[in-house]
Amino acid sequence: MKKNIHPNYGKARVSCVCGETFETGSTKKELRVEICSKCHPFYTGSQRMIETGGRAERFRKKYGLAK
C-alpha cells in the first residue's frame, strides 16, 4: 500500500437525536444520526413512523397540495 494517501482511521463518537451516544471507528471524529438501534422500530418492536420530510413534502404542505 502507498504511504500517506489513506485517511486516518480512529475512534468516533456517534450521537443520535434520541440522545443515545456510542463509539465506533471512522475517519471522522463525530457523527450525528437520526435513527439508531435504541430508537429504530425494528429493534424496539414499536411501529411508530418517523417523518423526516423532504423538499417535495415541505412544498406540498406549504401550498396545500395533495400527494
Swiss-Prot record:
| Cofactor(s) the protein requires to work | Zn(2+)
User: Which InterPro entries does the entry link to?
Assistant: Ribosomal_bL28/bL31-like_sf, Ribosomal_bL31, Ribosomal_bL31_A, Ribosomal_bL31_sf
Keywords (A to Z) from UniProt = Metal-binding, Ribonucleoprotein, Ribosomal protein, RNA-binding, rRNA-binding, Zinc
Does the record bear RNA-binding in its keywords?
yes
Q: Name one GO molecular function term.
A: structural constituent of ribosome
Q: How is the cofactor bound?
A: Binds 1 zinc ion per subunit.
Assigned protein family: Belongs to the bacterial ribosomal protein bL31 family. Type A subfamily.
The UniProt subunit note reads as follows: Part of the 50S ribosomal subunit.
Give the protein name, as stated in the record.
Large ribosomal subunit protein bL31
- Gene from which this protein is expressed: rpmE
